[in-house]
Regions:
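Short catalytic helix/loop segments, enriched in acidic residues and glycine
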Residues: 21-40
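Short, electropositive alpha-helical surface patch
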Residues: 60-65, 69, 273-279, 362-378
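Radical SAM enzyme core and accessory elements
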Residues: 2-6, 69, 75, 166, ...
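Radical SAM [4Fe-4S] cluster-binding motif and immediate context
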Residues: 182, 186-351, 358, 371
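N-terminal [4Fe-4S]-dependent radical SAM core
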Residues: 10-19, 23, 158, 163-208
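Residue-level signal for the nucleotide or nucleotide-sugar donor/cofactor binding architecture
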Residues: 60, 134, 236, 267-270, ...
Length: 488
């Protein structure tokens, strides 16, 4: 039995909940539930017995979740939620109430943080509390309350939550101050097996690590970081970060790679150099990758390479300065060119992230983004439409101007639960964006020089396996036959 049951609910096969854009990705990526397991570790550190079930990664069915609930009979059930899956997620709150009428149910995640009242209304009594923002310490307080006598009057004293009072009216307690990231324990990785998670771009098996929270950026398309983590950069002590790497390697000695999922890993020179120097000093032999801004201090790259950094996941975003400025990215095309060239010179693998759908964007500017991506020395790319999630600045703008397509949360994914284009602009329609995504991938990957470069990058059997997997996903997406320039 467990006092607290934390569920990453299943949706459909290969649905990735922990990604920035929750959906089934074309590459069928599955990401580690690092945030959830950090909260689990906080609960366990406080002495609670916790059961954790990653129904999404394990592709579990409703009956398996039901059996786990009945076996553990928790007093508190915690549900992770996403925008497209919110209605499905809430059915597991109803299931918990049906099986365990006395249990309390709590929802966490960016979607419910952005839409607490809508969530409570949809729940129709199957949800007791919505936690807004960082939930690590909030869940600990709710678990204490569940064990000592739950009441709405006591809920009023817990910061950062929303619930319905005795009159049926929504109550939103004051926001919780952002926590000290150095107080957080390492994620409770003993609840999962890293081999459940996959990404063709990473060496298998890999694990994710978050070295800080918050971001000073003002990107209008970003939802999760400003909503959940705030606008202030809070980086963990570099020695603590490398302690976590050592912990992961001791627990899972077969790991091939560590992925720093921190959105702003390269934003602080002091943090990056501290982490790299500690890795070198401790003689850790592990490849690692990270998210990277284009305005990173280029003098850091040699040290990053020496400490084992293999791949940079770079948010280039657009190929015109007008589009970058329209989404308040705070970077320039010159930053992009300099970083890509220096990374290639030093031997990094570079994955470029590009988007379509900036305010004021046209077909011509979108084609400029494709051309710009092809001009940069990169190994892999992704193209997507801007995913205007509730809680983001661009969502508010799109809603006000009538550019937003979905009229229900399920509309953020298509009929196959893959990411859907949700914007249709005056000079760039949804259909054009969909076509441009496929055209960009086709034009980038089917160039002879790109095919040759990718073949040259195959040095191990693991490299070959990842390339074959990626190629299969590429072909399954129907990209080879796509051409948006064909007459309709």
């Amino acid at each position: 039995m467990a006092e607290v049951f934390v569920l990453n609910p299943p949706v459909v096969k290969d649905f990735c909940r922990s990604a920035r854009w929750a959906a089934r990705s074309r590459g069928r990526v599955q990401r580690h539930p690092d945030w959830l397991l950090t909260a689990v570790a906080v609960l366990e550190q406080a002495g609670f017995e916790v059961a954790f079930l990653d129904g999404a990664a394990m592709n579990l069915g409703r009956q398996q979740v039901s059996s786990a609930l009945q076996t553990n009979r928790p007093g508190l059930v915690v549900l992770h939620t996403t925008t497209p899956s919110i209605d499905s997620d809430l059915t597991y709150g109803a299931l918990a109430k049906e099986l365990l009428p006395d249990c309390k149910t709590v929802a966490v995640g960016p979607h419910v943080t952005a839409e607490p009242e809508d969530t409570l209304n949809r729940a129709k009594g199957c949800l007791d509390v919505v936690v807004r923002g960082e939930y690590d310490f909030t869940l600990r307080e709710l678990a204490e309350l569940a064990g000592s006598g739950w009441s709405r009057s006591k809920l009023a004293g817990i910061l950062g939550i929303s619930y319905v009072d005795d009159e049926g009216q929504p109550v939103h307690t004051p926001a919780r101050p952002y926590l000290d990231v150095n107080e957080l324990p390492f994620p409770a990785w003993h609840h999962i097996d890293p081999r459940w998670y996959r990404d063709a771009g990473k060496r298998f098996p890999f694990i994710t690590l978050i070295s800080g929270r918050g971001c000073f950026g003002r990107c209008t398309f970003c939802r999760d970081v400003p909503l959940m983590e705030g606008r202030k950069l809070r980086m963990r002590d570099p020695e603590l970060v490398v302690d976590e790497i050592e912990y992961c390697l001791s627990r899972f000695p077969y790991l091939k790679e560590v992925m720093f999922e921190t959105d702003t890993f390269t934003a602080s020179r002091t943090h990056v150099s501290g982490v790299c120097e500690a890795i070198v000093r401790r003689r850790l032999k592990i490849a690692w990758s990270c998210n990277c801004r284009t305005d990173v201090d280029l003098s850091l790259l040699p040290l990053m390479k020496r400490s084992g950094c293999r791949m940079l996941m770079v948010g280039f975003e657009f190929g015109t300065q007008e589009a970058l400025d329209a989404v308040k990215k705070g970077t320039t095309l010159e930053h992009s060119v300099r970083l890509a060239n220096e990374a290639r010179r030093l031997g990094f693998t570079v994955h470029g992230c590009f988007m379509f759908g900036a305010p004021g964007e046209t077909r011509e500017s979108a084609l400029d983004t494709i051309a710009f991506a092809k001009s940069l020395p990169m190994d892999t790319v992704q193209f997507s439409g801007i995913c205007a999630y509730p809680g983001s600045e661009i969502y508010q703008e799109a809603t006000t101007k009538g550019f937003l397509i979905p009229n229900r949360w399920r509309g953020w994914v298509d009929e196959n639960w893959e990411q859907a284009t949700v914007l249709s602009l005056p000079e760039l329609s949804k259909e054009e964006i969909d076509g441009l995504i496929d055209q960009g991938l086709k034009e980038f990957y089917l160039r002879p020089q790109q095919i040759l470069q990718m073949a040259r990058a195959i040095r191990t059997l693991d490299d070959l396996r990842r390339k074959i997997y990626g190629l299969r996903m590429f072909l399954d997406g129907g990209l080879v036959s796509c051409d948006v320039n064909k007459p309709s």
